[in-house]
């Protein structure tokens, strides 16, 4: 027997390791046998005259031998357990590596809660630019007249190969991150400290600019008087207020656009009532009251419930698996627990009379809630399911028959379904009818179809036909596709067919079974058929809880096979069927809206992130950064959905996701913001201290220019007298003759195009293709790869060297940077009046204003008007 077990074990993964173990074990057993034999001989020789002692010694030795055999078997089992454990670890590692949904349930629930999107507003205006002054003159003395200029607020363009296009893309993304859903100027307005009439100005930054300008010693009197006249204007008739704001033209255009395109809508009790799903609103078991009274200035941001535009169920197996698993974990929290069940001890006594061989009594006693939550949760989340059972346990197989009665085959894992169907056919149906065993054929899944053709008994054949043709219905409710059980299952009438089949099956001869075993099987089937009324009530209870919770699903339901499955023990199904009572349980009202809210928040966040990444793809494409940015864009999009681990998604699915996102049109607000930024690109470039508008090249050395605010520098602010050639046009055409000809004529030229001050690519890509004989002297004088502006800083606060003002030495250069003049700040031209509603209140969580109670006792199922369970 031991050797047979060993031959089986050699089929395991670590065959060589087991072989070594076997050799050691055989050697130990052989030595033990020889030792026992020697002991027997010694005992016989020494105790010839005492046969009783010899017998006792022999029994002792036999016991020792049996203990040794048991020890060897234990070692063998431990080896098997180790191998199985190692296999489990390997499988677990594979799942961790390739399935992004591998995480704890608590973490999934937490991430689901984090997906909530709050209405985005701000207490200050959006600004790309701010005001800056140059306080020192060229000779190091403080200026008597201060000049103020508009400068870029987030001027963080790094040196090197970083393109100005990438800078504008990051600038655009920054605008998208801060783009508000609504704006209320009244909340951000502050007092104007210099107002003659206690007026207000729009925000703190505008106030800071006022203070700096007012405190400037050289600010003229008419400017101070103008600042004292700045105040807000209120119109009570229209409930609007106008506030003065000090803004750059680009910021003014953006903020006015945000004010005109707010997402908020007026809020009334009707809006809240419309948020309640129609099915719940008309459910006789729930009473909804909206006690809050909302004023005319109440506002809310409607949820963004556009249906899945990517199609996660089609071609994204890893992502779909992660989403459905998260949905399953979330849905189970809201399925109610069964209460007032039948006494388990009494039921088990009846079942023990059937000589049932249950794998786990613990599962039998405590599995009813697990099975109840499992059935409802898997359909709500459209998860693939698998049933674990023991073929010899006919009570579990009968419970599986009930599961096949109410659950279509499309939701089962194919392998699990085939195994379950074969077990039911070969253990119950065919032996009852005296038919030969059905054998499995590779790839053949039509087990019950074949059985239907061979079975002549009408009730059994009707049940088989029902299982073969059972499918979920698809019902569109308020634009959302939901899975629906058939009418027979919803009303519980299908249990009559199930019960009739059980009675017909139990009355069959079971000719091939021994008499005791036959009676046990028939007793088990009769035990189930005697609970027909309770099973019918259970079916109605399952369907009612499912349909009630499914009304809270706001995303189309698609029944697609998942990579991982949810498993249930058949003994848990038996526990549910045998211990269910006539006590009705329905979802708690508070949990109902919590489930509804979590689904709304996820879909809203999902749509917002789609719009963001689509806008980013559009911007990257328009800025010629499409190829560089795609993988990063898609990865960031997936990670922002909270329930996915982006690095674990296979590359083919990421590329497919990229292609789907690329075909989605850009949302209007995001497209308009990009248009505003691109239309004002030149203005933004001029305000940056890190971006220049081109490079000046000369064959002969040129003296450095004198700039009032900077000093001697190789930065040129004026293009007069220079030939201008566009860098991008040269790169597109590939014709560099214009540059060569100009340099040969010793005519200074400007290669115009936005580049960083410090660069080693944008200019070099062009200059490296020019005739080296013409350009050699320029390269010799200055390293173009490290082109920087030469600024001789003359500053009394600086520890750098000083340049004597009357020094006759004039520095020269053959390269210079072309930088357009920054826009000078003029307060009278920079003040704009922004208008918004004077006062309104935005409500975020609308469901807290709905008071929901349940009717006791529970009235009826909303489908057919009959009671869910026949309570006594």
Curated annotation (Swiss-Prot):
Ranges of Basic and acidic residues composition bias in the record: 11-56
Intracellular or extracellular location(s): Virion
Oligomeric and partner information: Homodecamer; each decamer is made up of two conformers of VP2, called VP2A and VP2B. Interacts with a VP1-VP3 complex. Interacts with the intermediate capsid protein VP6. Interacts with NSP5. Interacts (via N-terminus) with NSP2.
GO molecular function: RNA binding
InterPro entries: Rotavirus_VP2 (IPR007779)
Pfam families: Rota_VP2
Cystine crosslinks: none
Domain of life: Viruses
RNA-binding in keyword set: yes
Family classification: Belongs to the rotavirus VP2 family.
UniProt protein name: Inner capsid protein VP2
């Amino acid at each position: 027997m031991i050797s047979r077990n060993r031959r089986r074990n050699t089929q395991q993964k670590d065959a060589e390791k087991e072989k070594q173990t076997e050799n050691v074990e055989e050697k130990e057993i052989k030595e033990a046998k020889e030792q026992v034999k020697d002991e027997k001989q010694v005992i016989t020789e020494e105790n010839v005259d005492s046969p009783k002692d010899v017998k006792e010694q022999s029994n002792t030795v036999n016991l020792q031998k049996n203990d040794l055999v048991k020890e060897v078997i234990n070692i063998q089992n431990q080896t098997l357990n180790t191998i199985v454990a190692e296999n489990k670890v390997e499988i677990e590692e594979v799942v961790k590596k390739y399935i992004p949904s591998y995480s704890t349930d608590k973490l999934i629930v937490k991430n689901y809660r984090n997906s909530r999107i709050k209405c985005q507003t701000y207490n200050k205006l959006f600004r790309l630019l701010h005001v800056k002054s140059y306080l020192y003159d060229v000779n190091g003395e403080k200026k008597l007249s201060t000049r103020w200029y508009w400068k870029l607020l987030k001027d963080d363009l790094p040196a090197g190969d970083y393109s100005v296009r990438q800078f504008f893309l990051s600038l655009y993304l920054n605008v998208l991150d801060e783009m508000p859903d609504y704006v209320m100027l009244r909340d951000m307005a502050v007092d104007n400290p210099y107002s003659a009439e206690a007026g207000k100005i729009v925000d703190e930054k505008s106030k800071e600019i006022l203070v700096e300008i007012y405190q400037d010693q050289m600010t003229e009197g008419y400017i101070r008087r103008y600042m004292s006249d700045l105040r807000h204007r209120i119109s009570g008739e229209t409930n609007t207020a106008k506030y003065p704001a000090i803004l750059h033209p680009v910021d003014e255009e953006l903020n006015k656009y945000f004010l005109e395109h707010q997402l908020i809508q007026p809020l009334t009790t009707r809006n809240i009532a419309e948020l309640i799903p129609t099915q719940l609103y008309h459910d006789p078991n729930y009473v909804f009251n909206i006690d809050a009274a909302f004023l005319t200035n109440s506002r809310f941001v409607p949820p963004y419930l556009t249906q899945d535009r990517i199609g996660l169920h089609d071609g994204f197996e890893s992502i779909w698996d992660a989403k459905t698993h998260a949905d399953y974990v979330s849905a189970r929290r809201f399925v109610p627990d069964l209460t007032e069940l039948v006494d388990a001890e009494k039921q088990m006594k009846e079942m023990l009379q059937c000589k049932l061989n249950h794998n786990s009594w613990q599962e039998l006693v405590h599995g009813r809630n697990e099975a109840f939550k499992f059935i409802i949760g898997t359909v709500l989340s459209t998860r693939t399911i698998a049933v674990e059972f023991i073929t010899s346990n006919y009570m579990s197989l009968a419970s599986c028959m009930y599961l096949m009665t109410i659950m279509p085959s499309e939701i089962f894992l194919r392998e699990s379904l085939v195994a379950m169907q074969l077990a039911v056919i070969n253990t119950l149906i065919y032996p009852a009818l005296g038919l030969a065993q059905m054998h499995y054929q590779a790839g053949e899944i039509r087990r019950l179809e074949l059985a239907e053709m061979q079975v002549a008994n009408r009730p059994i054949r009707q049940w088989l036909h029902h299982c073969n043709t059972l499918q979920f219905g698809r019902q569109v409710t308020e634009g959302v596709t939901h899975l629906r059980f058939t009418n027979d299952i919803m009303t519980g009438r299908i249990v009559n067919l199930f019960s009739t089949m059980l009675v017909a099956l139990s009355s069959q001869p079971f000719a091939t079974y021994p008499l005791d075993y036959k009676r046990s099987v028939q007793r088990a089937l009769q035990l189930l058929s005697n609970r027909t009324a309770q099973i019918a009530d259970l079916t109605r209870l399952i369907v009612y809880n499912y349909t009630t919770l499914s009304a809270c699903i706001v995303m189309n339901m698609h029944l697609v096979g998942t990579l991982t499955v949810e498993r249930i023990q058949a003994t848990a199904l038996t526990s549910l069927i045998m211990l269910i009572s006539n006590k009705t349980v329905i979802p708690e009202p508070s949990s109902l809206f919590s489930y509804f809210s979590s689904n709304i928040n996820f879909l809203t966040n999902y749509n917002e992130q789609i719009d963001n990444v689509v806008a980013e793809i559009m911007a990257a494409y328009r800025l010629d950064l499409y190829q560089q940015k795609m993988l990063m864009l898609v990865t960031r999009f997936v990670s922002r959905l909270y329930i996915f681990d982006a690095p674990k998604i296979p590359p083919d699915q990421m590329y497919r996701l990229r292609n789907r996102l690329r075909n989605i049109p850009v949302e209007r607000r995001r497209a308009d913001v990009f248009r505003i930024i691109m239309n004002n690109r030149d203005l933004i470039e001029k305000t940056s201290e890190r971006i220049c508008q081109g490079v000046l090249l000369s064959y002969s050395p040129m003296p450095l220019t004198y700039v009032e605010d900077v000093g001697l520098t190789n930065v040129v602010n004026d293009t007069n007298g220079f030939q201008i050639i566009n860098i991008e046009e040269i790169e597109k055409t590939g014709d560099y003759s214009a540059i060569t000809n100009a340099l040969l004529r010793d005519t200074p030229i400007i290669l115009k195009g936005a580049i960083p001050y410090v660069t080693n690519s944008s200019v070099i890509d062009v200059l490296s293709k020019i005739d080296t004989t013409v350009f050699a002297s320029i390269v010799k004088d200055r390293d173009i790869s490290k082109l920087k502006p030469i600024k001789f800083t003359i500053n009394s606060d600086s520890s750098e060297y000083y340049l004597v003002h009357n020094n006759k030495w004039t520095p020269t250069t053959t390269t210079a940077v072309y930088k357009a003049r920054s826009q000078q700040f003029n307060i009278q031209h920079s003040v704009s009046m922004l208008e918004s509603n004077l006062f309104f209140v935005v409500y975020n969580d609308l469901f807290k204003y709905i008071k929901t109670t349940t009717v006791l006792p529970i009235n009826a199922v909303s489908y057919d008007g009959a009671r869910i369970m026949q309570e006594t």
